[in-house]
Design a protein with these regions (language model features):
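Conserved acidic, metal-coordinating active-site core of Asp-based
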Residues: 99-209, 213-218, 230
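Asp-based phosphoryl-transfer active-site loop
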Residues: 4-19
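Short, structured coil segments at secondary-structure junctions
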Residues: 57-60, 68, 165-168, 221-222, ...
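Mg2+-dependent phosphoryl-transfer enzymes with acidic/Ser/Thr/Gly-rich catalytic loops
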Residues: 1-5, 23, 181-263
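Short, acidic loop-to-helix structural element flanking the phosphoryl-transfer center
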Residues: 19-38, 81-88, 129-131, 186-197, ...
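Active-site phosphate-binding/coordination module
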Residues: 21, 25-119
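Residue-level signal for inorganic ion chemistry
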Residues: 33, 44, 68, 150, ...
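Short active-site oxyanion
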Residues: 37-41, 60-62, 147-150, 204-205, ...
C-alpha cells in the first residue's frame, strides 16, 4: 500500500543531537517525498511554543502532533486538545516545591518554568537548543488556562514515587533527566489514529519515525514504524524497521528502502 503520510519526531530523529540541525539529506528526502504527494507531519513531545529548530522544513509541514499527542492540529484547526486535570497540575507544582525540582508547565500556546534549576539550562538550552523560554515568567497566569503537558526534571527512580500523585496522567520519558507528563490517552499513537480519521486515510498508509520512549506508541500504530539507528534499544524492539542514525542519512535511507523516494 502506498504511503500517504509521514510522521517525524524532532529531537534525535529530524534534528541531530550533535549538530542541532536537520541534515541536508533529510531535508532533500522530505522535499522528494512531498513532491510524490506524501503529507508531512511533525510528531513531537515539544510544546508548540518551543518548536524552534525545524525552520528548514517548516514550509513543507502539513500538520503537527505536539505535547506527545495532547494537541494535534492542521493549520488553525485542533484535531485533539487534551488538558491535564487542574488538581493534578497543582499536585505536581506543590510536589516540585516540596521536593525541590524544576517543572516546565506547558499551556496550549505558552510555557513557563517553575522552580528553575541548572539542569534545565544544561538539557534544554545547551543540549536541545531551546533558547526562547524566559525563566522569569511566572507560572500563575499559565495555570489559568488548560495545561497540556508537564515536564518535571527528576530521575526514573523519583518518577516511580511522584507520577502516582497524578492518577489520570501518563509519563513518556525520552531523556534520563526529565519526562513528559500528559493526560491518559494523550500519546502519539492515539493522536495518529485521530489524524488519520480526520484525513480519511488508513494507518497502513502512514510511516512514522522516532528514537525515544515517547515515540513507541506511534511506531507501533503506524503501518510502518521506523526506529533511528541512534534510538533506544526498547524503541528498536517495537519498530518494523531500524534505519541508520540521524547523522548517517537515516530518514533518506528508510525512504529509499520502502520505495517512497528513488535513490
Amino acid at each position: 500500500m502506498a504511503i500517504k503520510a509521514a510522521f517525524f519526531d524532532i529531537d534525535g530523529t529530524l534534528v541531530s543531537f550533535q549538530t542541532h540541525q536537520i541534515p541536508a539529506s533529510t531535508i532533500k528526502a522530505i522535499e522528494q517525498a512531498k513532491e510524490q504527494g506524501v503529507k508531512i507531519f511533525i510528531s513531537t513531545g515539544r510544546p508548540v511554543a518551543i518548536i524552534n529548530n525545524i525552520d528548514a522544513i517548516r514550509h513543507l509541514v502539513d500538520g503537527y502532533i505536539t505535547f506527545n499527542g495532547a494537541r494535534t492540529f492542521i493549520d488553525d484547526k485542533d484535531i485533539t486538545l487534551m488538558p491535564i486535570p487542574e488538581n493534578e497540575v497543582r499536585a505536581m507544582i506543590d510536589d516540585a516545591s516540596r521536593r525541590d525540582y524544576a517543572v516546565l508547565v506547558c499551556g496550549r500556546d505558552d510555557v513557563a518554568l517553575h522552580n528553575h534549576k541548572p539542569i534545565f539550562d544544561e538539557i534544554f538550552v545547551h543540549n536541545l537548543g531551546v533558547n526562547n523560554i524566559d525563566i522569569n515568567n511566572p507560572i500563575e497566569p499559565l495555570l489559568s488556562q488548560p495545561v497540556l503537558q508537564l515536564t518535571p526534571f527528576f530521575s526514573e527512580v523519583a518518577e516511580q514515587e511522584i507520577v502516582p500523585l497524578m492518577p489520570h496522567c501518563i509519563s513518556a520519558r525520552w531523556n534520563p533527566c526529565f519526562t513528559d507528563i500528559t493526560v491518559q490517552g494523550a500519546d502519539k499513537g492515539n493522536a495518529l489514529r485521530q489524524l488519520t480519521k480526520y484525513l480519511g486515510i488508513s494507518l497502513d498508509e502512514c510511516i512514522a519515525f522516532g528514537d525515544g520512549g515517547n515515540d513507541m506508541s506511534i511506531l507501533q500504530t503506524a503501518g510502518i514504524g521506523v526506529a533511528m539507528g541512534n534510538a533506544n534499544e526498547s524503541v528498536k524492539a517495537v519498530a518494523d524497521y531500524v534505519t541508520s542514525s540521524v547523522d548517517d542519512d537515516g530518514i533518506r535511507n528508510a525512504f529509499i528502502h520502502f520505495g517512497i523516494i528513488n535513490n
